[in-house]
Amino acid sequence: MKKNLILFGSFILLTLLTVTAKAQEMDPLLQAKEYFRQLDSICSADNGLLWGVNLYGPVMLVSPADRVIIANRQNKSNTLVEKEGVFIGRLPDNTGIANTAFEWDGELWTMAMWNALSPDDNNARNRLLVHECWHAKQQSVGIMPVMTQNTHLDQEEGNILMRLELMALSRALQAVDLQEIKSYTTDALLLRHYRQALFPNNNENEFERHEGMAEYTGYRLCGMSDLEIRKQLVTDLETYAGKTALANSFAYITGPAYGFTLDRLTTGWIGKVRTGEALPGIAAETSGLTYPPDTLALHVAVSGIVEKYNAGVFVAATKEAFKEEMLETGACYRYDRHYFRI
């Protein structure tokens, strides 16, 4: 009996210790402290090597449900309360909650929503946090924030050409031979150049510098190997290539896709981005691409890419899907004479 009581007591003690350990593990303050430690370590390891500035700064994690803040430092007005090595408070009601960089209490802060941070996937969490930290520093490295002005990517011609570009970028990331990488990169650039000739009132390149470089930086510093990153990007490119709405999101995939392709082709390209150059221009120079002289010649080149990728069925199916969607919504369907007929 005594032996059984000892065993039972040991079981209870073990259970209590396990529950206590799990409770500590799930304590949001301790979690946040660990998240900040990892982020600080990542940014300190880079220490400006990538962009010339250390990306670590004021960071707050916000619970959307109750607007509770857990921050890595005190705010200027000293209104946050220190506890467990972090600072807690409440975000004012007139301040929006998002994954973003914003000015608060006289400082530029990085904000991340608590429920957007994976407790189990360090790489995914750090990628998001680094992405937003980069936004807080982007103007200091010469890149202005912009809103997308690319509604053509949600329309038939623009959408198809963008999705073909994504297919080309996927092939470039998967290629091993240097000439193959350049060839597929050239295909992507020709598709973009043609699309931008058809839709000149776009800011694709500017939006790509804004969101694409944030996402590239998140990937570059999050802790994944280059091979792991390229595999993840290929998977994501396949997902994006199935979307009929890309105006607001394309740069999150094209930016890192071009970035990690350029990493395999050249060095020092980030310095060119900082001085105002766009990724397609840098990639064209690196690949030795000379664009066809006019839209008609571009049309011929793009039609050749469609044939090379056996994408005729994809183009036809996507055109039909857009037509059906327009008919369902009562919109007027228009066939654009500029678009290739295959």
Feature map (PLM): residue ranges:
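Bacterial Sec-dependent N-terminal signal peptides
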Residues: 1-26
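N-terminal mature-domain "stem" immediately C-terminal to a signal peptide or N-terminal signal-anchor/transmembrane
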Residues: 24-83, 214
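Non-catalytic terminal regions of proteins
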Residues: 38-41, 271-342
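Catalytic zinc-binding patch centered on the HExxH motif and its immediate surroundings
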Residues: 88-107
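Short pre-active-site segment immediately N-terminal to the catalytic Zn-binding motif
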Residues: 114-129
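Active-site recognition of the HExxH zinc-binding catalytic motif
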Residues: 127-139
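Post-HExxH zinc-binding segment in Zn-dependent metallohydrolases
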Residues: 140-196, 204-230
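Active-site-proximal alpha-helical
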Residues: 198-228, 237-293
